[in-house]
């Protein structure tokens, strides 16, 4: 006796074709089942003519999840005679936000008329400016969330009062392989040169 399993794949960035799923467990007859199916252009993977499951349902897992996604949890599914069981899997993109703290390179805190507030920074994807942020009175800002990738950087665009422009390009360190969950936070300490440094 056999049945079918349909896995429906979705993702935040709509990449659903070519994803491999594994179905494994022990059938009602005591036979080990270990099968693979790949999603089509619509994100559907079909396991056909699978031996019906026993009291313990089969396990379904996504295989070789792309590094940009959080690995979805395994699911279980019973296979019943002449029925189609459906399970849905969603890929969630790994995201990051960064808190940047600007400080005085020499003293740590601003000297004289200098201030850490009002410096304008850009967050760049490759060479493209994506957003601008302005430091608060504590010399800080926190970005919104962005999708993890290897080429995010922070650059100072306009220094705050009493400081020179720091032209250093700082890598964010938001490579997707560093993370396993959806929401990730990272920090960057930015020391700024004052005119007395030159």
Briefly describe each language-model feature range.
Residues 1-192:
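Solvent-exposed loop/turn and edge beta-strand elements of beta-rich ligand-binding domains
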Residues 193-198:
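A short, hydrophobic C-terminal helix/tail in secreted or cell-surface proteins
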């Amino acid at each position: 006796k056999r049945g079918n399993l349909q896995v429906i794949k979705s993702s935040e960035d709509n990449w659903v074709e070519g994803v491999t799923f594994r179905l494994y467990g022990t059938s009602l007859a005591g036979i080990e089942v270990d099968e693979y199916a790949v999603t089509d252009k619509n994100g559907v993977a079909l396991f056909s003519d699978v031996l019906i499951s026993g009291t313990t349902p089969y396990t379904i897992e996504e295989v070789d999840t792309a590094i940009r996604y959080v690995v979805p949890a395994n699911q279980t599914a019973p296979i019943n005679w002449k029925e189609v069981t459906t399970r849905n899997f969603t890929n969630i993109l790994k995201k990051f936000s960064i808190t940047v703290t600007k400080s005085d390179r020499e003293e740590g805190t601003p000297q004289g008329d200098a201030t850490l507030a009002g410096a304008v920074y850009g967050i760049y994807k490759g060479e493209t400016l994506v957003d601008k942020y302005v430091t608060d009175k504590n010399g800080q800002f926190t970005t919104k969330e962005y999708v993890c990738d290897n080429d995010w950087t922070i650059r100072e665009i306009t220094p705050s009062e009493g400081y020179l422009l720091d032209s250093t390009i700082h890598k964010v360190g938001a490579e997707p392989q560093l993370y396993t969950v959806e929401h990730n936070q990272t920090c960057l300490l930015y020391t700024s040169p004052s005119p007395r440094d030159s």
